[in-house]
């Protein structure tokens, strides 16, 4: 049983390290809720309205 707890703790530790803590999912969802698209560069004629993916991409509309 103790081995099971240690295995569970190790898996949870690895999982928590993989989850971004800077709110990047929230910014991406907020962009899509505003009918925008996350892109590296906005196309000609599109307007930059925010950031996505932890400020690595632009939210274009």
From Swiss-Prot:
GO terms for biological process: cell chemotaxis; defense response to bacterium; defense response to fungus; killing of cells of another organism. Disulfide bonds join 31-59, 38-52, 42-60. Residues 1-21 form the signal peptide. It is found in: Secreted. Keywords: Antibiotic, Antimicrobial, Defensin, Disulfide bond, Fungicide, Lipid-binding, Secreted, Signal. Pfam families: Defensin_beta (PF00711). A 1,2-diacyl-sn-glycero-3-phosphate 1 binds at residues 24, 44, 53-54, 61. Despite modest sequence identity to mammalian defensins, shows significant structural similarity to human BD-2/defensin beta 4A. Exhibits antimicrobial activity against fungi. Antimicrobial activity in a pH-dependent manner against the yeast C.albicans; activity is salt tolerant and retains antifungal activity in NaCl concentrations of 100mM. Permeabilizes C.albicans cell membranes via targeting plasma membrane phospholipid phosphatidic acid. This is Beta-defensin 13. It comes from Crocodylus porosus (Saltwater crocodile). The lineage of its organism: Eukaryota, Metazoa, Chordata, Craniata, Vertebrata. The gene is BD13.
């Amino acid at each position: 049983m103790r081995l099971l707890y240690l295995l569970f703790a190790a898996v949870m530790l690895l999982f928590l390290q993989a989850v971004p803590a800077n709110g990047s999912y929230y910014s991406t969802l907020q962009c899509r809720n505003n009918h925008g698209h996350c892109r590296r560069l906005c196309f000609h004629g599109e307007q930059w309205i925010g950031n996505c993916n932890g400020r690595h991409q632009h939210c274009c509309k």
